[in-house]
């Protein structure tokens, strides 16, 4: 029987930055200030988890956004537009990243429980290595540590490709995909896990897919969020998630269930 020996965590929206607001705010500013195009929160969030330059391309490719661009500039967007917007995105993101490194409630306790079981903690992200030079130390100062980090810069392609997971497995000496759980809060996270053939687990509360700040979430009764949570669960399951958990605190029990299922 192959028990789970490695958990690969996403960063923003899963481990830190409740609601995944650091990149959201930067994307909104870039489209508004750089190109004069207002995009919705939903449009900005939909491609979350991708390498950030790919995220910009994905938003520009949305029919409504593409139509606005063509109406404003009388042409299609091109690589130069993407490069200019990405430069502006980095400026906005780097200015605020340090403020979005607080661990999401339950993460520190859950990671401690996994480590007690001898489980290694790897990580993947849509952030670049330079961005993680801010995020990782900020999170570590608040108690969150991983055993390994892989950024899109280190592999042939970022999410939803499986390469960052595979590199984590090599770095952590985990020989089988059956021994790995990928945990994330975006559709790109789910697909990354599915494409790697590992166990793919989605987290709802605090996620980009839910798109709610911690303050807003705590200001309303839990039952008022059930409809939105149901929508998020359905999207994650449709993307191929093996399990969708309400919070990260449910992860140890989920891993136990996987181990027992494998034994059966």
Swiss-Prot record:
Q: Which SUPFAM superfamilies match?
A: HAD-like (SSF56784)
Q: Which GO terms describe its molecular function?
A: magnesium ion binding; phosphoglycolate phosphatase activity; phosphonoacetaldehyde hydrolase activity
Gene name, per UniProt, is phnX
E.C. number(s) listed in UniProt? 3.11.1.1
Q: Whom does it interact with, and what assembly results?
A: Homodimer.
- What cofactor does this protein call for? Mg(2+)
Alphabetized InterPro entries for the sequence: HAD-like_hydrolase_sf, HAD-like_sf, HAD_sf, PGP-like_dom2, Phosphonoacetald_hydro
The entry's protein name is: Phosphonoacetaldehyde hydrolase
Reactions that this protein is recorded to catalyse: phosphonoacetaldehyde + H2O = acetaldehyde + phosphate + H(+)
Q: Does the keyword Metal-binding apply?
A: yes
Query: GO CC: one term?
Result: cytosol
- The UniProt record gives the binding positions of Mg(2+) as 10, 12, 185
Q: Bound how, and how many: what does the cofactor note say?
A: Binds 1 Mg(2+) ion per subunit.
Give the signal peptide range.
none
What PANTHER family does UniProt report for this protein, alphabetically?
A: PHOSPHOGLYCOLATE PHOSPHATASE, PHOSPHONOACETALDEHYDE HYDROLASE
Q: Which UniProt keywords apply?
A: Hydrolase, Magnesium, Metal-binding, Schiff base
One GO term under biological process is: DNA repair
Q: Provide the active-site residues from the annotation.
A: 10 (nucleophile), 52 (schiff-base intermediate with substrate)
Q: What does this protein do?
A: Involved in phosphonate degradation.
Organism, as annotated: Parabacteroides distasonis (strain ATCC 8503 / DSM 20701 / CIP 104284 / JCM 5825 / NCTC 11152)
Family designation: Belongs to the HAD-like hydrolase superfamily. PhnX family.
